[in-house]
């Protein structure tokens, strides 16, 4: 989950690749610039790229942070630490605190990817040892109390 929207993951990915030395900072700048230009085209009503694809990206890339904070119901967010989409989840409690939101639970599952599979040393998910049952049991237990 990334409350800042899906496009954020691509910006962060280029940055992380540069930080790790996988690409140069100039390459990261170029990648990010292309992402910005493509994203800008989605908001141009005269663009030929303005299609259902663009509409999909606009909806998935819209920040949901304010909506999330404004929810009156309890909020439970679980995420795998190895999911680039989840980087911002570490900061969510700060935003909740600023707005006085206290009915939330944010849980990081270390060394798991987006679908809660462990990551092997080769960097690939271990699909034989998924942790969905752990995540769901934790959520069910939390929801019974909230």
Q: Predicted regions: what is each one?
A:
Residues 1-70:
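Accessory cap/linker subdomain of secreted extracellular hydrolases
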Residues 4, 82-83, 113:
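Catalytic metal-binding/acid-base residues of hydrolase active sites
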Residues 52-58, 76-82, 124-128:
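Second-shell loop/turn segments in exported
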Residues 74, 92-94:
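Conserved, well-ordered alpha-helix/loop/beta-strand core segments that scaffold catalytic motifs
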Residues 82-91:
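Conserved alpha/beta-hydrolase "acid-adjacent" motif
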Residues 105, 110-146:
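Catalytic active-site module of serine/aspartate enzymes centered on a nucleophile-bearing elbow/loop
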